[in-house]
Amino acid sequence: MSLLPETKLDVLLAHHASLENQLQSQVGADTYVKLMRELAELNPLIEAVKAYRQVGAERGEIDALLADAATDAEMRAMAEAEHAALEAQEAELAQQIRVALLPKDAMDDRNVMLEIRAGTGGDEASLFAGDLFRMYEKFAVLQGWSVEVVSASEGTMGGYKEIIAEVKGRGAFAKLKFESGVHRVQRVPDTETQGRIHTSAATVAVLPEVEEVDVDIKPDDLRIETMRAQGAGGQHVNKTESAIRITHIPTGLQVMMQDSRSQHKNRASAMNILRSRIYDAEQQRIDSVRSAERKEKVGSGDRSERIRTYNFPQGRVTDHRINLTLYKLPQVIAGEALGELIDALTTEHQAAQLAAQGNAA
């Protein structure tokens, strides 16, 4: 008995063959690039399907051998051991294919608008926000992505009260989307003379970079104000009105941008951030309803949820959504072991999707 619907596998193989045939015909440069990209995404799945069918065929041969009364005891014992190994391999490939066939988030391949804000904890929270930004920056470099700071408000003792950066790279949102939420740190500050552990927090928001066609924003729904940029002490640092504040009246969402001397650039940056926030606000509303129905631990969309604790004295990082603790805090903060947490969260999310499919079937 097949563990997967064979008709669906036939359709996949036929689609793959069709793409390869199209690639051999005369197509334009844009179509060629599109076909190559789709084939590159599909190839690992097709390889798994072919391996699954090959293992199934081999298991069928062993079944026939075991069903043959003429098979002697020694051969039967060898066949049974081989049958068990093939069954396990077949089940593993079937699970791999099921995961690959799960519905993809339409935003997974988008760039990311990463927003980090210091929360409770004063200067220590700002320092922690800086640590988190550098962690994501180093992780991005390891992925081959680029990071560009869009806006930053530095803390009094270092770090950031708020920092917004654009992370550009294939699959950036897919990897980082589960990082949204409250991150908590427990450590002894440099200024602490009694050796007491302080707790502070920072909030991370990971928003997919959306285009104008993704969000319908009516010009009448925007209030755009210009002003002179201000420094840390409130003094004006620019003689021209280059700073921009844009308010989306229906939602009350507001973005202020003054990092560039160019009003045009500040306005473009503010609109990019505003589009992402409007889209994200609607997705949070949808996700909160869905997660309440499914009782999902990962991807609930709740930004007020404490998702992770970084305990420096114990050298551990705990993700509270999946009860996973890694005693690799230096490696996580360095961006090197962050992928282990991200992979575990992705696996948990996929398991929830598979369970939902099973319940719906």
UniProtKB/Swiss-Prot annotation:
Major location category of this protein: cytoplasm
Keywords from the UniProt entry: Cytoplasm, Methylation, Protein biosynthesis
Keyword Cytoplasm assigned: yes
Keyword flag Phosphoprotein: no
Superkingdom per UniProt: Bacteria
Function: Peptide chain release factor 1 directs the termination of translation in response to the peptide chain termination codons UAG and UAA.
UniProt-recorded name of the protein: Peptide chain release factor 1
Organism encoding this protein: Rhodopseudomonas palustris (strain BisB18)
